[in-house]
A protein has these predicted regions:
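Membrane-proximal basic amphipathic "stem/tether" segments
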Residues: 215-267
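Short, acidic, metal-binding catalytic loop of nucleotide-sugar glycosyltransferases
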Residues: 20-30
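Catalytic core and acceptor-binding pocket of nucleotide-sugar-dependent glycosyltransferases
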Residues: 134-226
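Short beta-strand-to-loop acidic/aromatic patch adjacent to the donor-nucleotide binding site
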Residues: 76-88
Length: 267
C-alpha cells in the first residue's frame, strides 16, 4: 500500500488536479491523507483521511499525518509519501520509487536551485512507514546548513536533514530537470517525474529572488549617503518581483487546467 500525506491551504483548486495526476501515474493502491485549512467547502470524499484542525505549522501537520499513517498502516514496508498540495507526479513515479528504495532509505526533492538548499524537501519525499518511525522523522526547521554563499540557513526539513546526517543515512536526491525555466525556483520538474508549482498557496516570494536583487548604480551610490536607502530600494524591488511571480503563477495555473500535458513545455 502507498500512503500519501498532503496539505491544502486557503484554496481547494489544487485538489482535483492533484488527484487526477495521482490516479494517472500510480498503478498500485494508494490512500491520501490530507490537511485542509481554511477551505470549508473542500470535498473530502477522495481522501482516506482529512483533518481541518487549525494547525499553522506546515511541518507539524506533516508530522501528525505521518503518525496517523503509521497507525493505520498494516506493514512497515508500506510506502510513505509526502507531497505538497501544489505538487504531483507527471511521469512513472512508482517505478522510480521502487527502484530507489531498493538501495536507499529516502528519495526526495532537493532544491539546490534555492540558493543551495541541501535538505530533503517535502514537496516530494518517499520512504517507508517503518523507516520514518525508526528514525523519528521530523519536518520542522531548526538544523542549519551553509547555503552557496556560506550563510547559515534553515527551513522546513532542516531537522530531517540533521537526522539523516547524524545516522549516516544515504538518500537519493531528485534534482531539477527543467530544460525551460520560467523562474529559477517555481514551476519545477524533478527527475522528469515530479512537478512542483511552488507558492501555489501563498505569495510568490522566495529566498533566491531576494539574493539575486541588484541595485542600480545610482541607488548604490545614494545608499552610501542616505541611511536605509538601499534597504528600501531592495524592498521595493522585491515587491515588484513578487507581483510578477504571482502573475506568472496564475498564467501557468491556467495552462495546467487547460492542458493535461502542460509540463512538457518545461522538459
Amino acid at each position: 500500500m502507498i500512503h500519501i500525506a498532503t496539505i491544502h491551504w486557503n484554496t481547494e483548486r489544487w485538489i482535483d488536479l492533484q488527484q487526477n495526476y495521482l490516479r494517472k501515474h500510480f498503478k498500485s493502491d494508494f490512500r491520501v491523507y490530507a490537511w485542509l485549512n481554511n477551505i470549508p467547502n473542500a470535498p473530502t470524499d477522495s481522501f482516506y483521511y482529512a483533518s481541518r484542525e487549525p494547525v499553522d505549522s506546515h511541518a507539524v501537520k506533516l508530522n501528525i499525518l505521518a503518525d496517523i499513517i503509521h497507525a493505520s498502516s498494516k506493514r512497515e514496508d508500506d510506502v510513505l509519501i509526502f507531497l505538497d498540495g501544489d505538487a504531483f507526479p507527471v511521469g512513472d513515479i512508482e517505478t522510480l520509487i521502487n527502484e530507489k528504495l531498493s538501495t536507499v532509505k529516502i528519495v526526495a526533492v532537493q532544491r539546490l536551485e534555492n540558493n543551495g538548499d541541501l535538505q530533503p524537501h517535502p514537496c516530494f519525499c518517499a520512504t517507508t512507514v517503518g523507516f520514518w518511525r525508526e528514525i523519528k522523522g521530523d519536518w520542522k526547521e531548526g538544523y542549519r546548513w551553509k547555503n552557496k554563499n556560506g550563510e547559515g540557513v534553515t527551513d522546513v526539513g532542516g531537522n530531517f536533514l540533521k537526522k539523516l546526517t547524524e545516522h549516516d543515512v544515504k538518500w537519493s536526491p531528485l534534482l531539477r530537470s527543467n530544460k525551460i525555466n520560467l523562474h529559477p525556483l517555481f514551476f519545477g520538474i524533478y527527475d522528469d517525474v515530479i512537478y512542483h508549482h511552488g507558492a501555489g498557496f501563498r505569495k510568490g516570494e522566495c529566498r533566491v529572488d531576494g539574493a539575486n536583487i541588484q541595485l542600480k548604480p545610482r541607488d548604490k551610490m545614494l545608499s552610501k549617503f542616505i541611511p536605509g536607502y538601499g534597504r528600501r530600494m531592495r524592498r521595493k524591488a522585491n515587491h515588484r518581483l513578487v507581483a510578477n511571480n504571482d502573475e506568472l503563477s496564475e498564467q501557468v495555473f491556467r495552462t495546467i487546467q487547460e492542458d493535461p500535458r502542460f509540463y512538457t513545455q518545461f522538459m
